[in-house]
């Protein structure tokens, strides 16, 4: 179901949600960090979804063991490097890797700017070996409050030329978007693109706010848009991209079943929506699964799946020249 003549993109992929279980074990051993289990198979239920979680917040707790082993900046470099390797091994041509430097720094009180630098270094190092296109998106983790997000933003701004966009993620219900308006005003002044997690745990009003007040040109998840016909029209008319993550939405119990997922209706409505992974290591999936298993289960036709693949390229935070180069590179094999 993947058109190999077209670039394959993953635009919603959390670097800190894709720390390999093997790496968690290895780093814990290196740094003498206590884990709930010390064998891969017994650790897996603690770091990977084995059954659907009751909420987004409980799903996010699975990520905590991955960042708990980031005891130094070398560990951050390693997971950044491995993220690029995983993108290449998944056959993805272009990925936007997003990360929250505060979340990664928090457990071991690492310098936030140092974490940003380590992520950039790890990615650049991997790109010497692996022929993929990578862009970085900084995340403000709303869960930790406005002050933490300001520290996060400051660290990201120190390397603003290496960061493509800013995102807002975390506890959408507990920390609504209006708290972070000053942060996003600053980000837009910098020239960054804006994508926001919205309409996942909260309703359609969260999406409206992300677009109108935070300046989002793309929305992460956005499933609750289906509840507001006026918003559906607006998304289509203004070409606001929806970064759909099918498996993730089931595992967080945001949507009860793939058959009920609104992605098909988004595409039928002319909304530019794409297929993405979210947190591959935590979910136990890769992008191919979203195309070959999840999308058909969500009722998408082969033509709609191909359209979602095209949409990924359309929505990507790159210039038209970069888009054309990517198309040419893939078509030439």
Curated annotation (Swiss-Prot):
Q: What biological processes does GO assign it?
A: adenosine catabolic process; hypoxanthine salvage; inosine biosynthetic process; nucleotide metabolic process; purine ribonucleoside monophosphate biosynthetic process
Residues recorded as binding Zn(2+), renumbered to this chain, are 12, 14, 197, 278
Tell whether Metal-binding is among the UniProt keywords.
yes
Gene Ontology CC: cytosol
What GO annotations for molecular function exist for this entry? 2'-deoxyadenosine deaminase activity; adenosine deaminase activity; zinc ion binding
* Site residues (Important for catalytic activity), renumbered to this chain: 221
Any single Pfam family the record assigns to this protein: A_deaminase
Locate the residues binding substrate: 14, 16, 170, 279
Q: How is the cofactor bound?
A: Binds 1 zinc ion per subunit.
Q: Specify the enzyme's EC class, one word.
A: hydrolase
- Which InterPro entries does the record cross-reference, listed alphabetically? A/AMP_deam_AS, A_deaminase, A_deaminase_dom, Ado/ade_deaminase, Metal_Hydrolase
Q: Which domain of life is it from?
A: Bacteria
E.C. number: 3.5.4.4
* Reported cofactor(s): Zn(2+)
Where, if anywhere, are coiled coils annotated? none
Catalytic activity as recorded in UniProt: adenosine + H2O + H(+) = inosine + NH4(+); 2'-deoxyadenosine + H2O + H(+) = 2'-deoxyinosine + NH4(+)
What keywords is this UniProt entry annotated with? Hydrolase, Metal-binding, Nucleotide metabolism, Zinc
Which residues catalyse the reaction?
A: 200
Q: What does the similarity note say?
A: Belongs to the metallo-dependent hydrolases superfamily. Adenosine and AMP deaminases family. Adenosine deaminase subfamily.
Q: Which NCBIfam families does the entry mention?
A: aden_deam, PRK09358.1-1
Report the function annotation for this chain: Catalyzes the hydrolytic deamination of adenosine and 2-deoxyadenosine.
The name this protein goes by in its record: Adenosine deaminase
What lineage is on file?
Bacteria, Pseudomonadati, Pseudomonadota, Gammaproteobacteria, Enterobacterales
